[in-house]
Amino acid sequence: MCIRDRGLITCDSDDVGYTALDEATKKACVSVAYAQSMYAGAANANTALAGEFLGILAGETPAEVESGLLAARRMIEQEASFYSANDDDSIVYFAHCISRTGSYLSAACEIPEGSPLAYLIAPPLESMYALDKALKAAQVRVCAFYGPPSPTNFGGALLTGSQSDCQAACDAFARAVIDVAANPIETLSDGASS
């Protein structure tokens, strides 16, 4: 591919942004030239439009880049999102099942393009507890691990397996984050405190 044109995109969630870039590679003849999280998250941005993430799509023509940007925007606005684990929205998580990866996340995970993926992110403690539950609930494997703290003070992993197993992992992860939010101090059966 002869790269002649580029398009820039930002949003208030880096993980939604990465998912959107991957979607763009499925819908248009583009590649991801750059993708990076901003430190401390969108709520702590130092300018109005800084967002939490910056992505750059590259393509051969303006039309291809525009098509990729539109696909990314649709993903951001209509599909991928963080969810609240409690009533005051102070604990959020991202548990998104991707039925088939594009070139971007496939390369990042070193898996074949078109593989199912469970994209799991939460605050530090919640992410590690919930990741354990997700791995026990489904036949999936870790293909990328984000040990906390990430640049945005979260953690999690990308898991691959069958589409149904990836969905089961997402569901288990979500339930576990919600459980921690509802019971932040709990003694487990082995006596350890979470």
What are these regions (language model features)?
Residues 21, 62-76, 164-177:
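Charge-rich, low-aromatic oligomerization/scaffolding segments with amphipathic character
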Residues 52-88:
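Hydrophobic, ordered structural segments
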Residues 10-16, 119-127:
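Short, surface-exposed ligand-recognition loops at beta-strand->loop->(often short) alpha-helix junctions
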Residues 31-51, 140-149, 153-154:
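A cross-kingdom feature marking solvent-exposed beta-strand/loop segments within repeated
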Residues 39-44, 83-99, 149-154, 185-194:
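Short proline/glycine- and acidic-rich turn/helix-capping motifs at secondary-structure junctions
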Residues 1-5:
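Conserved small/polar residues in nucleotide/adenosyl-binding loops
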Residues 27-31, 72-81, 138-139, 173-182:
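A common structural junction motif
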Residues 17-34, 125-139:
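Short amphipathic alpha-helix segments
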